[in-house]
Amino acid sequence: MMTEEHTDLEARIIKDIHCKEIDLVNRDPKNINEDIVKVDFEDVIAEPEGTYSFDGVWKVSFTTFTVSKYWCYRLLSTLLGVPLALLWGFLFACISFCHIWAVVPCIKSYLIEIQCISHIYSLCIRTFCNPLFAALGQVCSNIKVVLRREG
């Protein structure tokens, strides 16, 4: 009984990222396409004052643009959406793999080696430079500057 409750609790706590629900209403929750892809008729076609087409032409042009953009996007996403999602998933999996298994270990190795070198560098500074600059400080500590105005 206790084991079943523990397993049930673990099942509720651990959520697999592959099973998470997606929002079919807000498909851009992080607003990554806020200003980039939003292109409406008014963003592309505009008639300056004094150079207007017939009202009917303007209305039909608006409808044609909007409907053709809508259905062309739907057709392209139907034909290419899944293959491109597969391609992008593969690409980002490769990038993640390289980052996890190559980049981070290289950086960690570099930091370990640099730490060893930094100890040697610090020792050299304390051994050679600190006494030199302390002596120069003593020599220059008795310098007095007097400013006089002439004239």
Swiss-Prot record:
Residue ranges, annotated region (Required for interaction with DAG1): 64-114
Record PTM: Sumoylation with SUMO3 by PIAS4 may reduce agonist-induced internalization and desensitization of adrenergic receptor ABRD2.
BP GO terms, sorted: actin filament organization; calcium ion transport; cardiac muscle cell development; cardiac muscle hypertrophy; caveola assembly; cellular response to ionomycin; cholesterol homeostasis; cytoplasmic microtubule organization
Keyword field: Cell membrane, Golgi apparatus, Isopeptide bond, Membrane, Ubl conjugation
Record InterPro entries: Caveolin, Caveolin_CS
Cellular localisation: Golgi apparatus membrane; Cell membrane; Membrane, Caveola; Cell membrane, Sarcolemma
Subunit comment: Homooligomer. Interacts with DYSF. Interacts with DLG1 and KCNA5; forms a ternary complex. Interacts with DAG1 (via its C-terminal); the interaction prevents binding of DAG1 with DMD. Interacts with TRIM72. Interacts with MUSK; may regulate MUSK signaling. Interacts with POPDC1. Interacts with CAVIN1, CAVIN2 and CAVIN4.
Protein name: Caveolin-3
Gene: Cav3
Keyword Cell membrane applies: yes
One Pfam match: Caveolin
Intramembrane spans: 84-104
